[in-house]
């Protein structure tokens, strides 16, 4: 697998760059707040990842470039999670990665929903991300799959009661949920919040 290429950056756009290496030009997708600069004289190392996917019986390749090796590692972890594709993974890189690490480490679901490129579904997926704590000698941070499963249970329960997925996601993102929460209590609070919001909409349109 290619980890990086060494070449000249011949084009820089908002979400794409072109890197020329060994007389071949490569298109790469990049995050929106990237720091790549066009330079036709001096080559540089560009960390990258190639993703292959099947589209109408054809294998298509898509390239992604990163400012640092750390960004590449985060991206690789993101796309391994259920419900997070390459576009969402790239958008997540626009956030402060150290803050995101702390949110995941502390199971701060509410903060995760507020990240750029995130929502309730993405936040639940991030809770299951396996990290290593740099402040504790590289000790493994176990993914909080139990909490992620609890969020899935709440979402499925509310959906079975007839609430719209978008309304559920919006309500969950507005509630500050603490560790060791009671699922039934949170469901009741979400229903209360959605009912209040629906009443507000009804009153405005009346």
UniProtKB/Swiss-Prot annotation:
Residues 1-67 are annotated as: Domain I. Residues 141-145 are annotated as: Flexible linker. Residues 68-141 are annotated as: Domain II. Signal peptide: none annotated. Residues 146-206 are annotated as: Domain III. Homotetramer. Forms an RuvA(8)-RuvB(12)-Holliday junction (HJ) complex. HJ DNA is sandwiched between 2 RuvA tetramers; dsDNA enters through RuvA and exits via RuvB. An RuvB hexamer assembles on each DNA strand where it exits the tetramer. Each RuvB hexamer is contacted by two RuvA subunits (via domain III) on 2 adjacent RuvB subunits; this complex drives branch migration. In the full resolvosome a probable DNA-RuvA(4)-RuvB(12)-RuvC(2) complex forms which resolves the HJ. Has three domains with a flexible linker between the domains II and III and assumes an 'L' shape. Domain III is highly mobile and contacts RuvB. The RuvA-RuvB-RuvC complex processes Holliday junction (HJ) DNA during genetic recombination and DNA repair, while the RuvA-RuvB complex plays an important role in the rescue of blocked DNA replication forks via replication fork reversal (RFR). RuvA specifically binds to HJ cruciform DNA, conferring on it an open structure. The RuvB hexamer acts as an ATP-dependent pump, pulling dsDNA into and through the RuvAB complex. HJ branch migration allows RuvC to scan DNA until it finds its consensus sequence, where it cleaves and resolves the cruciform DNA. This is Holliday junction branch migration complex subunit RuvA. It comes from Mycoplasma pneumoniae (strain ATCC 29342 / M129 / Subtype 1) (Mycoplasmoides pneumoniae).
């Amino acid at each position: 697998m290619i980890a990086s290429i060494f070449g000249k950056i011949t084009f820089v756009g908002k979400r794409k760059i072109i890197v020329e290496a060994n007389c071949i030009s490569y298109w790469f997708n990049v995050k929106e707040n990237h720091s790549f600069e066009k330079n036709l004289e001096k080559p540089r190392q560009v960390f990258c990842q190639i993703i292959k996917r099947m589209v109408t019986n054809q294998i298509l390749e898509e390239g992604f470039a990163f400012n640092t090796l750390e960004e590449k590692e985060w991206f690789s972890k993101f796309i391994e999670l259920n419900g997070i594709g390459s576009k969402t993974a790239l958008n997540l890189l626009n956030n402060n990665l150290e803050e995101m690490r702390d949110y995941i480490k502390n199971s701060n679901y509410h903060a995760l929903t507020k990240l750029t490129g995130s929502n309730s579904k993405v936040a639940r997926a991030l809770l299951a991300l396996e990290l290593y704590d740099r402040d504790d000698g590289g000790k493994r941070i176990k993914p909080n799959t139990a909490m992620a499963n609890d969020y899935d249970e709440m979402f499925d329960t509310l959906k079975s009661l007839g609430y719209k997925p978008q309304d559920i996601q919006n309500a969950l993102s507005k509630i500050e949920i603490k560790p060791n929460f009671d699922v039934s209590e949170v469901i009741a609070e979400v229903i209360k919040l959605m009912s209040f919001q629906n009443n507000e909409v009804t009153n405005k349109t009346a």
